[in-house]
């Protein structure tokens, strides 16, 4: 089993099929995906004093932070930066969009996760004489799909 280099795990917007390279979210430094399962309680009088559970709701979310930039070195507005995500999916339309998370190398057997999500929070920090950073939180809606490419 090969250990995955964290640099190869990236966040990108994708088509509604989850295939293709997607549009990489620029300047990401850290990203994580979380999948949760909340079993439902079925404890009853015959449970013998122990709680019992069955399958329940699942949810997923993605957190990302990185350097904040809204233009490239030539001064052209980024189309794959955090500002573009915020403008397109929060400020103008409050819409959900498809996102992919996973390996982006050309090596076969890369695992990618993709699904539809909403931006639930976004913040920018800008300290004096320091790199401006941004953080973004995405909450999935519906199924999170795993692809091996």
Task: Show where each model-derived region lies.
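A short, polar/proline- and glycine-enriched secondary-structure boundary/capping micro-motif
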Residues: 21-26, 75, 148-149
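Short, cysteine-centered beta-strand-loop-beta hairpins and adjacent loop/turn segments enriched
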Residues: 69-74, 144-147
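Compositionally biased, intrinsically disordered low-complexity segments enriched
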Residues: 31, 39, 97-98, 148
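Short, acidic/charged, Gly/Pro-enriched secondary-structure junctions
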Residues: 74-116, 120
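Hydrophobic transmembrane signal anchors and adjacent membrane-proximal interface regions, especially
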Residues: 9, 56-58, 91-93, 142, ...
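Residues within well-ordered beta-strands of beta-sheet-rich folds
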Residues: 63-65, 98-100, 137-139
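Solvent-exposed edge beta-strands and adjacent loop segments
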Residues: 2-70, 112-135
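Short solvent-exposed strand/turn elements
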Residues: 132-146
